[in-house]
């Protein structure tokens, strides 16, 4: 079969995802594949949990080096000469948006890029569940009874202290199926399948930063 191949095929490269757990990694994978359809089949994951946002100095450097080494290792397993086109490292800040978020995101991402050259630190505020609250219709598509109360709609969800509690106690309630962290990939699949990602109801700076990073990665790392 002849014809021009995609950037990933030509350069024998993969995108690597690291995160706190499997649910977060799978959620990120779903979102990345929507933004960059050429990545389907070209994403691999690191299973080790991520603990970066509180690290500084030599400790941060050491932890990032461990992730970078593992990323390069899983890339090599895809075939001789395969390189890491880009690394996405996800972690929840477990705190609301503010100066700490900006400083932490910058500090960790700079270290990732210093060691690898092409990487993005996906630091969710306050956690990835805050992203889900931007898409009430997607949550209802997963479980019809799940409803986001009006007081949480159209807001900056990065300012919510405990989005997970909101989902567990107020969105899914006490009757029927209750939200758990294992529902995250299904929720984000509903976000994509319903096209809700194009018009979030409210705002979240970390969500916007993530999509800006994906667009930048597509231009600079995957199709350069």
Each predicted region: which residue ranges?
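C-terminal accessory helical subdomains adjacent to catalytic cores in phosphodiester-
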Residues: 2-14, 23-54, 58, 65-224
């Amino acid at each position: 079969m002849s014809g021009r191949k995609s950037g990933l095929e030509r350069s024998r490269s993969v995108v690597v995802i690291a995160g706190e757990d499997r649910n977060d990694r799978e959620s990120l994978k779903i979102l990345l594949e929507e933004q960059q359809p050429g990545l389907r089949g070209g994403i691999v994951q690191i299973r080790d949990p991520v603990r970066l946002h509180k690290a500084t100095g030599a400790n941060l450097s050491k932890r990032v080096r461990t992730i970078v080494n593992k990323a390069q290792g899983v890339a090599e397993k895809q075939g001789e000469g395969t390189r890491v086109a880009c690394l996405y490292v996800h972690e929840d800040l477990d705190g609301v948006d503010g100066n700490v978020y900006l400083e932490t995101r910058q500090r960790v991402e700079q270290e990732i890029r210093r060691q690898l050259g092409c990487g993005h630190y996906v630091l969710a505020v306050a956690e990835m569940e805050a992203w889900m609250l931007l898409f009430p219709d997607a949550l209802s598509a997963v479980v019809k009874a799940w409803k986001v109360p009006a007081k949480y709609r159209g807001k900056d969800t990065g300012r919510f202290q405990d989005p997970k509690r909101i989902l567990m106690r107020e969105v899914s309630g006490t009757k029927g199926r209750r939200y758990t962290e294992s529902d995250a990939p299904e929720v984000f699949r509903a976000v994509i399948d319903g096209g809700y990602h194009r018009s979030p109801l409210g705002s979240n700076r970390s969500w916007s930063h993530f999509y800006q990073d994906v667009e930048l990665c597509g231009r600079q790392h995957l199709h350069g």
